[in-house]
């Protein structure tokens, strides 16, 4: 690059490229549950795809539109709103953003979801029954979300305060040193690039980060919550401060390896380096692994950010969405926005990301946020939510098996973020009641031309609330009623004929009496 982008260009580029990397890499991430077997990799543009969602009991295929991002960018925007809110950002993020995120999360990791559920119950992860899991949570869920702190600190240049904030943010959901150090190392790298006023030389970034280990690698006990003392008396797996030191040393060793590899120039092999960085191992989702991979790719492809992001997004076997997101954040901070192709500017919530950059850089974030929010109000019916005013764009349904459905409400925030809220419902017969003992008149095309049946609603309600009743379809219920109304009284024969439990037939017969 011949020109150094402005601070605003850098910060806007970092937010946009983070979302772009996330959206490019998400379909190919090993945990994405992509059901499109023939999806071609490496084309360099956004794609529509389907993901298997809902787990065992609410299984459904969810359509992901081209350019839509995952939890990585969702968390970046959640942290941004927390900083903009005007309240204590740690409290806002913990008790507003995280619990609400459970309604719209896309691809969130276990540590994040567990922490969010814990805060929803008005508890903290380090004091909960899952405290052991919390202190073993070393994933990249903390690293991926800390970019807004760097942007909000852009004009203050207070590196120590930045590190304090990133440390404080990380421990809200992750307790293992790998997660926290991954976040502080990433923030330090972003901050170095943000304030670099000369062209970054090949490999220079790696050496600057190595030299800064006493800043990003320091355990910041002074910012710990007063009740965050479990780390001193952990009775499982590791001694905390020893593990902190070991993880710091491991990151430095890997950075030295990257530096040595980069000196090979054109002979350096991406696969070899990423393998050494553990990107293909079971620990490939760790916070330190993600940031090390991103630092390598940004250092190697500094003059070709498009290729660098593609490499992160399309390398089979690595954590493609998060590594591409972090790589994108570094490239955006380095190169600004001018390099971003037109097709990549179709990323979900492009305008929102630009707005967030403007707000985080402003002297009065709350006032700037209000000005932008007010300009986006166009006669919508606004509704309140824990994260501010929203409006509904549309509502649609997705089937989940034979007896369930997912109601998806697409909403928008006033800053322009799109969220898909999910509501899970069992599909039941459309029978309404107002009194517990009221009889309901039911008709069926075959039998009701000459007959009428009366159901005792109290009995029918009792039957339908039985968990086993959910296994029988409405069609089978009608067939049972047909046979009973035609004079068949042998419940055993009806059950065998229709392959249902005899107790269900008897229950329906009893409700008809």
How does the language model describe each region?
Residues 1-479, 502, 507-513:
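Structured, active/binding-site neighborhoods that engage oxygen-rich ligands
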Residues 493-495:
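Short alpha-helical "recognition helix" segments of helix-turn-helix
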Residues 488-489:
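Residue-level signal for the short linker/turn that defines the boundary of a DNA-recognition helix
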Residues 482-484:
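Short alpha-helical segment immediately N-terminal to, or the first helix within
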């Amino acid at each position: 690059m011949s020109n150094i982008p402005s601070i605003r260009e850098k910060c806007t580029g970092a937010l946009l490229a983070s979302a772009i990397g996330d959206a490019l890499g998400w379909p190919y991430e090993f945990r994405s549950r992509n059901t499109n077997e023939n999806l071609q990799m490496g084309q360099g543009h956004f794609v529509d795809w389907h993901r298997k969602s809902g787990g065992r009991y609410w299984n459904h295929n969810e359509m992901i539109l081209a350019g839509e991002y995952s939890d990585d960018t969702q968390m970046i925007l959640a942290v941004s709103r927390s900083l903009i809110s005007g309240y204590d950002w740690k409290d806002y993020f913990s008790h507003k953003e995280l619990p609400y995120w459970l309604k719209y999360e896309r691809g969130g990791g276990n540590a994040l979801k567990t922490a969010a559920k814990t805060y929803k119950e008005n508890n903290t992860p380090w004091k909960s029954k899952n405290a052991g899991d919390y202190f073993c949570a070393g994933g990249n869920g903390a690293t991926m979300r800390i970019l807004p702190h760097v942007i909000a600190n852009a004009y203050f240049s207070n590196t120590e305060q930045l590190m304090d904030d990133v440390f404080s943010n990380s421990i809200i959901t992750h307790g293992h040193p790998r997660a926290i150090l991954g976040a502080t190392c990433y923030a330090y790298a972003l901050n170095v690039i943000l304030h670099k006023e000369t062209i970054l030389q090949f490999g220079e970034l790696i050496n600057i980060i190595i030299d800064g280990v006493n800043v990003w690698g320091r355990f910041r006990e002074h910012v710990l919550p007063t009740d965050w003392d479990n780390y001193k008396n952990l009775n499982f797996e590791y001694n905390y401060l020893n593990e902190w030191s070991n993880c710091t040393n491991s990151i430095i060793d890997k950075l030295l390896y990257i530096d040595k590899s980069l000196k090979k120039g054109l002979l350096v092999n991406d696969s070899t380096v990423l393998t050494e960085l553990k990107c293909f191992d079971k620990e490939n989702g760790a916070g330190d692994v993600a940031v090390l991979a991103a630092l390598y790719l940004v250092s190697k492809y500094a003059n070709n950010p498009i290729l660098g992001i593609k490499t992160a997004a399309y390398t089979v076997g690595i954590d493609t969405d998060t590594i591409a997101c972090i790589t994108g954040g570094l490239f955006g901070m380095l190169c600004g926005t001018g390099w971003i192709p037109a097709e990549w500017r179709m990323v979900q919530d492009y305008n929102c990301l630009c707005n967030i950059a403007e707000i985080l850089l402003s002297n009065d974030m709350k006032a700037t946020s209000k000005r932008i929010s007010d300009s986006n109000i166009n006669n919508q019916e606004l509704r309140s939510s824990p994260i501010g005013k929203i409006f509904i764009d549309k509502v649609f349904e997705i089937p989940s098996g034979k007896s369930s459905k997912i109601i998806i409400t697409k909403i928008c925030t006033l800053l322009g973020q799109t969220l898909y809220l999910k509501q899970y419902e069992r599909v039941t017969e459309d029978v309404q009641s107002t009194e517990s003992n009221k009889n309901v008149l039911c008709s069926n095309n075959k039998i009701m031309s000459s007959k009428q049946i009366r159901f005792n609603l109290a009995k029918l309600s009792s039957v339908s609330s039985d968990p086993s009743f959910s296994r029988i379809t409405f069609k089978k219920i009608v067939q049972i009623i047909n046979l009973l109304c035609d004079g068949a009284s042998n419940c055993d024969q009806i059950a065998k004929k229709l392959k249902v439990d005899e107790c269900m037939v008897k229950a329906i017969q009893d409700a008809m009496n």
